[in-house]
Amino acid sequence: MHFRVERLELVNPWRIAHGVSTERTTVILERDGGYGEAAIVPYLGESSAEILAALSSFASNRLEHPRAGYRVDEVDGIASRGAQCALDLALHDAEARARGEPLWKILGINAVTHIETSFTIAMDTPDEMARRAREANASILKLKMGGVDDEACVEAVRGVTNATLRLDANGGWSREEAARLLPRLARFKIELVEQPLSVADGEGFAWLRAQQIGVPIFADESVSTLEGVDSLAQNVDGIVIKLRKLGGLRQAHAAIERARSLGLRTMMGCMIESSLAVTAAAHLALLCDLADLDAPLLIRNDPFSGLTYRGSAVLLPPGAGIGAVPREGD
């Protein structure tokens, strides 16, 4: 097992309710020809050092107690969610490559269907967000919210595009702000809003739902376990699924199935991470209603190649496994 930390440079400053970044880091793992990844996400509270330590401990334990192969469910015992994610992806990738099959097939998905992603515009001035919306020329845009001029920003973007608009507050609004803003923003034909309230406001989604805000609510940061899906099912319209926060493909797949059984819509999302993790997520996106898989478009120095983007359409790579390949020199 080999792992390393990669620095990802962002094309534009990534300004969201949690803070602003010009670069992010991610852990890349290789095991038996399979690749995995765990992005370092500030709000998740895990450092690269903690993830590497958990992976080292797991690898050392396997050397002391050797047996043939790994089982994917063994990663559940790892304390670090990031380490779980990286190892889960690598094991799935290695298994699919060994079988000579694409990842979607070993996940039990019957056919490749059309995937369409949104393109995210970080928080900025109304004029700058409108400029980026115009340049993006995308059919679906996601606008980061949580600033002082949210309404003006949405109005400016809507003034330059007929694209489908999604909003993402990353928990940056209070209950009162969300209840005041969302009915006003609904006039701009908003498809949905992600995580309008803080994770810390456990009862907030029920309260906000009762306000009849007129915009479908999707929970993101508030759902990092299957139990989280259950607890919010009555108070949201959909769930954002991310490999990194759930601990890999196995748990993400289970979360999709749980959400669907509860009548919730699902969106496959991503962190700021490389084409490796985002391509893996795209295989599971075949089971979801919506997708937000634009991270490779937001970074300058992607260490992997994988998905192909044609406008808002996302095309899976051919070949076995996840289908992501290290770029020359990595």
Enumerate the language-model features and the residues they cover.
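Predominant activation on well-ordered alpha-helical scaffold segments within soluble catalytic domains
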Residues: S56, Q84, D88-D93, E155-R158, ...
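Metal-dependent enolase-superfamily TIM-barrel catalytic cores that perform enediolate-based chemistry
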Residues: K105-V215
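Conserved, mostly hydrophobic/aromatic
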Residues: L29-R31, L87, G100, L141, ...
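Catalytic alpha/beta core domains of metabolic enzymes, predominantly
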Residues: A200-A206, Q211-D294
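A cross-domain feature marking catalytic cores of carbohydrate-active enzymes
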Residues: A38, G77, F119-I121, L143-M145, ...
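Flexible C-terminal active-site loop/helix
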Residues: M1-L10, A17-S21, T26, M271-D330
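Residue-level marker for buried hydrophobic side chains located in beta-strands
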Residues: G34, L165-L167, I217-F218, I239
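Metal- or metallocofactor-binding catalytic centers and their adjacent structured scaffolds
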Residues: V5, G19, D32-R99
